[in-house]
Regions:
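Short, solvent-exposed loop/turn segments at the edges of secondary structure
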Residues: 25, 36, 85, 117, ...
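Solvent-exposed beta-strand/loop surfaces of large extracellular or lumenal domains
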Residues: 1-28, 52-73, 103-118
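Conserved small/polar residues in nucleotide/adenosyl-binding loops
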Residues: 353-359
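Short, conserved phosphate-binding/catalytic loop or strand-edge motifs used
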Residues: 216-225, 261
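Second-shell loop/turn segments in exported
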Residues: 27-31, 183-190, 226-234
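Hydrophobic/aromatic-rich core segments of domains that either
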Residues: 238-329
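Edge strands and adjacent loops of beta-rich recognition modules
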Residues: 21-22, 321-337
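Secretory-pathway-linked proteins and extracytosolic
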Residues: 46-52, 56-58, 72-74, 78-218
Length: 360
């Protein structure tokens, strides 16, 4: 056989397809030509610093690679493929003074750690990977297929404390006079804490449109401030949750942001396997109640029943471990059937059936 080297200068840089979230993502593509049976595509991807930072193009300034949580590294590496793969190798090098915890889930791989060039070098290898078999309505592949999770952060509480501080320092939930006027209007005549929480949650859910426009460097873990959200009346989940947190605080509640993963499990390794931002509010009994205004527009729920047994991490000042939402009570999801079957005098069967479903 022979080896054909592809010139990476021939890559094409395109705007990535986007819907509802327009954060300027790019996709880099290259044509490899027609492949014949037995051909193998061998490629290597090098990454530096943070794995999800929405970095913009520019000069090779090292500050571009500083992660939001400074000094910390994590990665989530799928070890499955949609195409037959001869060999996959993942290597990460970290400074000698750093510690890294990891775990391989739902499969096996060859792993090692070596001291090389003044660094710790971790390697993970899997051979002869075949496409993972899928089933109708199955769980997310991250919950079933082989994956590697790693993080230099010791525990979830550290991430919780950082998430709280980065948004409090930024002033994400600072009060706004015109928003305060709306809050006062909404809670007027509401006597219980749940009445107030409900009316604020549903106003935000129904009035902040889901449409994310990039605001530049602040995208990521930092929630946009009250003025921007209330003025624009649009944003992604973090903007909708941030608006609710601001409203709750202006109504006298203690509320904070939380990160969650809609659709799959979050592991005990504190790698940021999150795709969604929600809110938590402290009730009078001292417990935190999760709220998701993004998922409850024009319905009666405060936390979508589609998000049962879902992991989330509150960014609270005392710090928190990874939490999980409870199972929604069966009484909230009933189907009542009342049937009346009779025989008429002439022997004709007569049946009446009445179905009652919960309204949401």
């Amino acid at each position: 056989g022979k080896i054909d080297e592809l010139d990476v200068k021939g890559t094409c840089d395109y705007a990535a397809p986007a819907r509802a979230i327009y954060w300027g993502a790019r996709q880099i593509m290259i044509e490899v030509g027609a492949l014949q049976p037995g051909d193998v595509v061998d490629y290597e991807i090098a990454k530096k610093g943070f794995t999800y930072a929405l970095l913009t193009a520019g000069d090779e300034d090292e500050s571009r690679f500083i992660p939001p949580m400074r000094g910390q590294f994590y990665d989530i590496v799928p070890f499955w493929s949609n195409t037959p793969t001869v060999r996959k190798v993942y290597v990460v090098s970290i400074p000698m003074e750093k510690e890294l915890q990891f775990q391989f889930y739902q499969g096996e791989c060859a792993s090692s750690m070596r001291y090389e060039d003044g660094c710790k070098k971790y390697s993970f290898v899997m051979n002869d990977m075949v496409p993972f078999a899928k089933e109708p309505n199955m769980v997310d592949l991250f919950d079933a297929a082989p994956k590697l999770m790693m993080s230099s952060t010791p525990q979830w509480k550290d991430k919780s404390l950082w998430f709280n501080k980065v948004n409090e320092d930024y002033g994400s939930f600072a009060p706004l006079p015109e928003a305060q006027k709306k809050v006062d209007e909404l809670v007027k005549g509401k006597n219980t804490e749940m009445e107030k929480i409900a009316v604020l949650t549903h106003w935000v859910a129904d009035n902040i449109r889901y449409s994310g426009i990039s605001m530049g460097k602040g995208e990521g873990f930092t929630l946009h401030n009250t003025k921007m959200n209330y003025t624009d009346r649009c944003g992604v989940c973090k903007d909708i949750a941030g608006t609710l947190i601001s409203f709750l605080r202006m109504a006298g509640f203690e509320a904070y942001p939380a990160m969650t993963m809609a659709g799959s499990r979050v592991e005990s390794i504190p790698a940021d396997h999150f795709n969604h931002c929600v809110a938590v509010v402290k009730l009078s009994n001292g417990t935190y109640m999760p709220l998701d205004p993004t998922w409850v527009p024009f319905c009666r729920e405060l936390w979508s029943s589609a998000e049962q047994q879902q992991n989330y991490l509150p960014g609270v000042p005392e710090g928190s471990d990874l939490c999980i939402t409870p199972v929604s009570s069966p009484e909230n999801h009933y189907v009542r059937i009342k049937a009346d079957n009779r025989l008429a005098a002439d022997g004709t069967p007569v049946s009446y059936t009445h179905l009652t479903l919960p309204t949401t």
